[in-house]
Amino acid sequence: MKMKKITALLLALAMSLSLAACGGDSASAGGSTPAPTEPAAQTSETADGDGQAVVLDENGEVYAEAEDADAPTEYPVTLTDQAGREVTIEAKPETLVSGYYISTSLCIALGLQDQLVGIEAKADTRPIYARSAPGLLELPSVGTAKEFDLEGCAALAPDLVILPLKLQDAADSLAELGIPALVVNPEDQTLLEEAVALVAAATDTRARAAQLADFTVKQQNRLTELLADAERPNVYLAGNSDFLSTAGGAMYQSSMIEMAGGRNVAQEITDTYWASVSYEQILTWNPDYIVLASDADYTVEDVMTDPNLAGCKAVENGNVLQIPGDAEAWDSPVPGGILGSVWLSGALHPDLGIDGENMQIINEFYETFYGFTYQEI
């Protein structure tokens, strides 16, 4: 199984913890919209004249030295965000606004929840907030990516705002008001790693980010070793709103299946993101497992009793599953996204008897980064 390549930025953060990951192809977009046409800033790893490993930005300038990758951020600091914008932060941010669920979850994982003074709308629909940072539910809302409250955000006078790529214009407007705003775009594993590195550098939490990277890489390596000789069952992953919508090979969810020791039956679909298919196509694929997205609008029972799937191997054998979403959606590029592969590996390979160990790993993650165990839910 190919490993997901850890980006140079995240390697710099985590090298002091002696991380090692095998190279491989990176997943592409994990959302329902195409990936941005403007690429994130690129970095590369090399060595200076003394043999010290360094990370260079796209201009060939030193971004960070590996041995200091988890050292405190020195301010003022100028960073290039995932929209290619240069953002200067004069002093360590004491107050933050996050206009995006994934960046809010990341802030919690980095220990920044008490610095948040405003977050995205519909916080009460995020179980992980109530468990790990219930105070977030009382914070002012700054709206959504479709209806962002620029005036309300500015009124909070935050030291730093973190927004998704869709709100790049809002980030520019905030900058004109003298409020630094970072744009993040964690739509696949590599971009998620870059987003973690970016936010960590901006908020002086690089040591915590290295700890998060360490956990992720250890689980990638563990799954690779465990599943090296395992047969790969064919998996159909059904989308949130429509069973006949599936994740093609260019999506984050496809890499999740691969890491879990499965084969995405739709992996050859690369010219789209959530792709519409027919029942006939599913029957032709005849998957061993059907996996429903964590936020699916339909149930496992709906699929099991669907007459259009009569004769499908997964249905006949009772191998229709739904990705858990009790804490957050593991089939999306959140800080705990690796847990989707951890959980799915046990479901696809019951003969390995790793469910108990997997649950220990899941509990360890949430206890370490969010302050609760998954079994408490």
Language model features by range: what are they?
Residues 5-6, 11, 22-105, 207-237, ...:
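Bacterial Sec-exported substrate-binding components of ABC uptake systems
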Residues 17-21:
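C-terminal motif of bacterial Sec signal peptides marking the signal peptidase cleavage site
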Residues 82-84, 139-151, 270-279:
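Short helix-initiation/N-cap motifs at beta->coil->alpha
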Residues 86-88, 169-245, 266-268, 319-377:
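Extracytoplasmic substrate-binding proteins
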Residues 98-156, 160-162, 166, 265:
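A short, structured surface patch at a secondary-structure boundary
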Residues 149-158, 176-177, 276-286:
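Short helices/loops that flank or line small-molecule/ion binding pockets
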Residues 246-274, 278:
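Alpha-helical, coiled-coil/dimerization segments enriched in small aliphatic residues
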Residues 256, 274-295:
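Ligand-binding pocket segment of bilobal, Venus flytrap-like solute-binding proteins
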